[in-house]
Swiss-Prot record:
GO biological process: cell division; establishment of mitotic spindle orientation; microtubule sliding
Disulphide-bridged cysteine pairs: none
Domain of life: Eukaryota
GO molecular function: dynein complex binding
A Gene Ontology cellular-component term: microtubule associated complex
HAMAP family: lis1
Gene name tied to this protein: PAC1-1
Matching Pfam families: LisH_PAC1, WD40
Organism: Sordaria macrospora (strain ATCC MYA-333 / DSM 997 / K(L3346) / K-hell)
Compartments reported by the entry: Cytoplasm, Cytoskeleton; Cytoplasm, Cytoskeleton, Spindle pole
UniProt keyword terms in alphabetical order: Cell cycle, Cell division, Coiled coil, Cytoplasm, Cytoskeleton, Microtubule, Mitosis, Repeat, Transport, WD repeat
Alphabetical list of InterPro entries matching this protein: Dynein_regulator_LIS1, G-protein_beta_WD-40_rep, LIS1_N, LisH, PAC1-like_LisH-like_dom, WD40/YVTN_repeat-like_dom_sf, WD40_repeat_CS, WD40_repeat_dom_sf
Name under which the protein is recorded: Nuclear distribution protein PAC1-1
Free-text note regarding domains: Dimerization mediated by the LisH domain may be required to activate dynein.
Amino acid sequence: MSQILTSRQADELHRALIAYLTAANLPNTAAALREELNLGEDVFDPATAKKYEGLLEKKWTSVVRLQKKSLTPLVTQIMDLESRNHILQSELDNATPTSRQNKDPVAWLPRAPPRHTLQSHRDPITCVAFHPVFSSLASGSEDQTIKIWDWELGELERTIKGHTKAVLDVDYGGPRGNTLLASCSSDLTIKLWDPLDSYKNIRTLPGHDHSVSAVRFIPGSGNLLVSASRDKTLRIWDVSTGYCVKTLRGHAEWVRDVCPSFDGKYILSTSDDYTSRLWDVTVTNPEPRVTLIGHEHVVLCCAIAPPAAYQNLAAMAGIKKPPATSSAEFMATGSRDKSIRLWDARGTCIKTLAGHDNWVRGLVFHPGGKYLLSVSDDKTLRCWDLTQEGKCVKTIGDAHGHFVQCIRWAPSVIKDVSVNGDNGEPNGTPKKGAAVTPDSQIRCVIATGSVDLNVRIFAN
């Protein structure tokens, strides 16, 4: 006892024990202890006994409270570690060997930590887009600016100013040999910027009556750009003239996102009206070819599957032979109902992917066709294996410190790249549906943007 307690502490413990035994109506035991410790009536009188009465119980309950206080966060931490261990074990069980993954772009998936965290925006990041060839990345923010980064070096190259409200989306594309950057904003406008002329604003496209939510160059068209707006419409623009050539009406509420098919014939849109619509834009007056109904809340994002994914998605849909076209045969949508839905061209939901704990903000198909990637307000990036019925095989927890609002995959590099940086991929995906061909090379690079003001680069 003397090795643990000082003489004074030991004496106080003895007195507290005697007081406890006396109060517990155990006088014989108390007397035996007093005799053993040589604590006579002159030393341990009634006043002293009163002083130490209840002291032992107080000390004991304090220790119990301290143990609970100390153990509760420890138990939580253990449960969290067990959960992470379960996720990692699941990834290990479902993954190919790491060495093969690193060497095979078709099997590559992002992993933490990111290669770069790009910081400069002063308000939440809303969008990101890769240059089709060069190592340039554009990011848009609620701070009204667009920033151009070198994603390989992790360095800021320039800040573009021109919009007077939040920048909501950006995309690279345009005429062959003359890649442009398009941006759209809550200021109701779309702006075109020339990367070859220090990102000079070469044209502003007015016409929408409310915030412009999304912009995408249409593959194969060269000059055509599609936009989605809170005014409930989509518009198709000729970027060489600045004229709106078609207006698509059909949604009952805010149109949130838009994605053109790989052959440029179809456009998929999502809306606050809980629906997504597939439009045939080859006709003079486009109308929805099919309306996708099933989500229980606002549909925030969409993606059209590359032909490389058709075999996996066809099997999931129970189709023996995958489609041979490069049109919008399969699609994915993400919603505030926390789910992702996979659809076929007939408008049938072939699978619902559940796992996110908050709004699904962004979707992108792996160019190799095996995976679908998603980001969410739950701060995670998830990878869904289309060869395993859409099973979630990888989760990057805390991919950001706040809501993850956007995700883009760097477009594949085509071997016959022109000197001006056009590779036939106006919207970051190969022309004519050739998602992965002998003449293209997958770039294993992903960018995400968040409310935490950071853009993150995940790369092999």
